[in-house]
Amino acid sequence: MSFPDSYSPDPARYDGRMPYRRCGRSGLDLPAISLGLWQNFGGADVFETGRAILRRAFDRGVTHFDLANNYGPPYGSAEANFGRVLAADFKAHRDELVVSTKAGWDMWPGPYGDVGGSRKYLIASCDQSLQRMGLDYVDIFYSHRVDPRTPLDETMGALAHLHRQGKALYVGISSYSPELTRQAEAMLRAEGVPLLIHQPSYSLLNRWIERELLGTLDELGVGCIAFSPLAQGMLTAKYLGGIPADARAGKEGSLRREFLSDANLARIRGLDAIARRRGQSLAQMAIAWVLRDPRVTSALIGARSVAQLDDSLGALEGLAFADEELREIDAFAQEGDLDLWEGSAKLGSADLPQPRLGARGV
């Protein structure tokens, strides 16, 4: 697949099909559906396929693209490929885009690029990400996870430093517990930097944020962008008949074969039946369900083809749920024991080194 050098986005991209939601108590709106580049945009993938997906997303009103330093594979290649598309297709539209990236998981060899939240790692990683994407700044820079070996005030201090430098217009956190979210928000506020957004995992089979986190974010005025609303692809038609040979669960990766237990498959089939009665695909209903709560600013999806992207964006045509539908969904939308990120999200202040004496916001 090849494309002409010039690209003109669809002039109807802001015609109202894509709703935009205010992110917490900030001045920033995000599209109800954002596109993440965790999978399918790395150096091992077909560049022109990813380019077509990005173009189609923007044509459909998706203005927020989410990355991380180690997205690929190989690490860094998703940012590099996104930078190529930015330069070739989106350069004239940079001010229409919200670009985010993150750091916190392992990235480069040695003690300074491993899992971490140190000042050295976060600032170096942000600089590297900007270079790979060919940008002077990102709109949002995240601490991708809690680092149990680094005091929280050091991690938040690094985010505040990047914000003051103008390298990050906003800052966020991902997979933080409600307790640490409160502490992170207070530390940043003491530095004069608002915490814009939290990015937790959330789906019909992974509902941990409903217990306390959503209420905490609402109270603090922090936005929420839910990643993996399709439970790494489980909440699609792909697994209704078992595990296909080409499925992500059949390979090494984020979707483990044991997640597709008999109990989870029964839940998926039950949810699919409800989706069919609603006139939606299972994926569309799963995304719409995440967005049913106004405290969720955006659902962060992935896509491996333009057709898959279009199907997911079709969720916007059926966001309303009757009370009876929600009760029926609740019978199947139960914890599936598939939260890969709970190791970070369960950490509390007692699990971290104590802040330095005199740390602000403590």
Predicted regions and their residues:
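Conserved, mostly hydrophobic/aromatic
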Residues: 23, 35, 50, 57, ...
